[in-house]
Amino acid sequence: MAAAVAAPRLISLKAVAKLGFREISQIRQLAPLHSAIPHFGMLRCRSRQPFSTSVVKAQATATEQSPGEVVQKVESPVVVITGASRGIGKAIALALGKAGCKVLVNYARSAKEAEEVAKQIEEYGGQAITFGGDVSKATDVDAMMKTALDKWGTIDVVVNNAGITRDTLLIRMKQSQWDEVIALNLTGVFLCTQAAVKIMMKKKRGRIINISSVVGLIGNIGQANYAAAKGGVISFSKTAAREGASRNINVNVVCPGFIASDMTAELGEDMEKKILGTIPLGRYGKAEEVAGLVEFLALSPAASYITGQAFTIDGGIAI
C-alpha cells in the first residue's frame, strides 16, 4: 500500500477508504506459449520404472539433515540495502545489522538519517557504511556495489527497497510522474539485481529480496504508475529467480500493505477507521514485521529452498 513506501500521498488512502479494493472478477486462461518455450503442463516422467532405491535413500538422507548442514552458513554476510535511511528500509537495515550483517545503507537525499542508521548498527556491534546514490542510474549502482566490494570483498544479500510515489488519477497523470516512478521503482530494481547477480554468479551463492507492494498485486485508485512498477517487480523477480537458480541465487519478493508511518499517525480518527475497515486484521502493520520477514528470507537456512515467491504482509487485504 501507499503507506508502505516513502512519502506516500493521501489520495491513495482516501480512495481505499471510500471505495475499497475491487475483487478480480475472473482469471483468464493463458494462450499456449510458442513451442520454443517448455510447456510445463505436458511434463511427464519418461520412464515407467520406479525410482531406484539409491535415489530414494539419497533424498531421505538429505531431508534428515538439518538445514544448517545442507546449506552453507555465511558468517557476517555483506548486505546492500537501497532506500535504507528511513521507514521499512531503516527497519530492515537495523534488523540485519543486529543479526550480525555488514550493511551498506543506501540513501538518495537523507544523508543525516542514513548516518544515524549506520551508527545504530555499529552500536549493536555490527559494521555499516553509507552510500548516497540514485539507483535508477547505472553509474550510481555500479559505484554502490564497488563501494561494498572494496570495503568487504563480497556481497551476499541485496535488498531493493528504494521507491517513490507520484499519486494522481490516471486521467490527470503526467508522463513525468509515470516516468519517475517507473525509473526508480522498477528500473532501479533491474539495475541493482543485475549488478548483484553478476557478483553472486561467480561465487554461486546469493540472496536478493525485492520490496514490492500489495498494490502490485491488486492495484489501487490513483496509483497506476506505482501499481505498474510494483507489479513489474514481482514478474521481473520470478524471471530472475529462474535465471539465477542454477547458481544457487534465491530471488524473492515482499509485498507490504498499510504500514504504520508518520503519515498514518497524522490521519484523523474517521479516516483511520475507514482505512482499518479495509484490513481484515484491523490494524496497520509495523516496519519491524516487514523487516522480520526480510531477515528470514535473507539469512535463514530454512529459506534456502524458497525462490521466485511473492509474500504478502498486509493484514489480509489481498485475501
Swiss-Prot record:
Entry's Gene Ontology cellular component terms: chloroplast; chloroplast envelope; chloroplast stroma; mitochondrion; nucleus; plastid
Active-site residues from the entry: Y226 (proton acceptor)
GO biological process, one term: fatty acid biosynthetic process
GO molecular function: 3-oxoacyl-[acyl-carrier-protein] reductase (NADPH) activity; copper ion binding; NAD binding
Residues binding substrate: S213
Class of enzymatic activity (EC top level): oxidoreductase
Family: Belongs to the short-chain dehydrogenases/reductases (SDR) family.
The name this protein goes by in its record: 3-oxoacyl-[acyl-carrier-protein] reductase, chloroplastic
The species this protein was found in: Arabidopsis thaliana
Upper classification of the organism: Eukaryota, Viridiplantae, Streptophyta, Embryophyta, Tracheophyta
